[in-house]
């Protein structure tokens, strides 16, 4: 399980020196590995046991053994051990960590077995945002519309709840955006920052997004939004979406606004 490591010179040393060590317990209650968080500037920040027959990171979640004892059907997905512990210490006893920033499909399926409502609360640095985007897509692919909690001041969950407390965290949880609104707002932000000549080009991002929505009613809501934003007739927009869906997989999968002969009059 990787507590001791052999150096290039053949000597053995403590792999987790200068780190806080956390036992990793699977959902059956068995210790299967260890994680270490650096207490200084040592990189990487988090270090896990190596992959083995008993420890496979992609199949496990830190804190799931505790979560299983709760009756709460919400689950908050965070990055690290300290986030889980801090949230638990403040009464949020339904947090689990993905043992790093990258959620795997197997971890998502494990969450689906136990939770009805999934909240993603990763750090808001570039790596955390990228991991959030990936997690949103993974959950959507298995039929879960997760919600994304965005914490202010760039704080991670550990720092945030220690500074603002449980009620403020729950307030942020209540404001969490579902996956579709989260994705839409990200594209809307890109659109709003584009100059007038570039705005038309951003329509393809909206078309790609709209084509990814399976639920007809949900898609219709966002079609109305995009139709209003670009002053496009909904039937024309639907034509572009259908062309995108038909041609997905081809290299030339963008510029569907042009293929659908959409014309936008700048406002």
Q: Which residues does each PLM region occupy?
A:
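Phosphate-handling DNA/RNA-contact segment within nucleic-acid enzymes
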Residues: 1-114, 118, 131-132
